[in-house]
Amino acid sequence: MHRIAVPAAKGAPTAQAPVKVAARNLDFYYDKYHALKGINIEIPEKRVTALIGPSGCGKSTLLRIFNRIYALYPKLEARGEVLLDGENILSPKYPMNRLRSKVGMVFQKPVPFPMTIFENVAYGIRHHEKLSKADMQNRVEHALRQGALWDEVKDKLGQSALGLSGGQQQRLCIARAVALRPDVLLLDEPTSALDPISTSRIEQLVEELKRDYTIVIVTHNMQQAARVSDYTAFMYLGDLIEHDRTETIFSQPSKQQTEDYITGRFG
């Protein structure tokens, strides 16, 4: 039986990490379509949690609920609770600007803004904070360093971000997301449009970033989930089937559906 090789534990302490994000009895509807069904999940702080499952299972939908990006579109409704540090972000009283600063997101395809590299990173900061020129320069440099991009762009910050390679653009998007110093970083298949070398660099970056951020990553690549995550959640047809430590999910899953998926029997 084919199984995914899971790397040795990546230095995470054995003690239970504090819960950063928790979904409680979460349902989601696309108009009348019931896309997520009673999801209950706890996302540990400063760990990487991977969401896996076949296309259409609800993993990207769940990710988008964590920052309420669905609220930009009509006829979409979430019911239940999503707690960030114990506060329900689905409450109408929870400020959207606050949520956007606390939960960053990087999408499947790099989406640099049509402006300079510097302004791409500074853009979000300007909307949330008033910094001096020197402080802004320091913040942009720090974000680009966290995005593992500084050494490649430090001499061309005034050039268009559209001239960067695909892998560089995605790291720029990560730098732009962390520039606001969020608590949580959401990654929606961040390497699916990249070559193997760029993919490897992003995976290394994820490992580095979890020292400072709680990370949730959606991936169709089970080998990637095994490499980068501390915890893995398997979803199927809008249900959360199983959620456990990654080494457990890939070596001793408790549910037959999980076993069938990771061994390639369906998906």
Swiss-Prot record:
Reaction(s) the record says it catalyses: phosphate(out) + ATP + H2O = ADP + 2 phosphate(in) + H(+)
UniProt keyword annotations, A-Z: ATP-binding, Cell inner membrane, Cell membrane, Membrane, Nucleotide-binding, Phosphate transport, Translocase, Transport
Superkingdom: Bacteria
Domain ABC transporter: start-end pairs: 21-262
GO biological process, one term: phosphate ion transmembrane transport
Alphabetized InterPro entries for the sequence: AAA+_ATPase (IPR003593), ABC_transporter-like_ATP-bd (IPR003439), ABC_transporter-like_CS (IPR017871), P-loop_NTPase (IPR027417), PstB-like (IPR005670)
Keyword Transport: yes
Similarity remark: Belongs to the ABC transporter superfamily. Phosphate importer (TC 3.A.1.7) family.
Identification of the protein by name: Phosphate import ATP-binding protein PstB
Native source species: Xanthomonas campestris pv. campestris (strain ATCC 33913 / DSM 3586 / NCPPB 528 / LMG 568 / P 25)
Name of the gene encoding the protein in the UniProt record: pstB
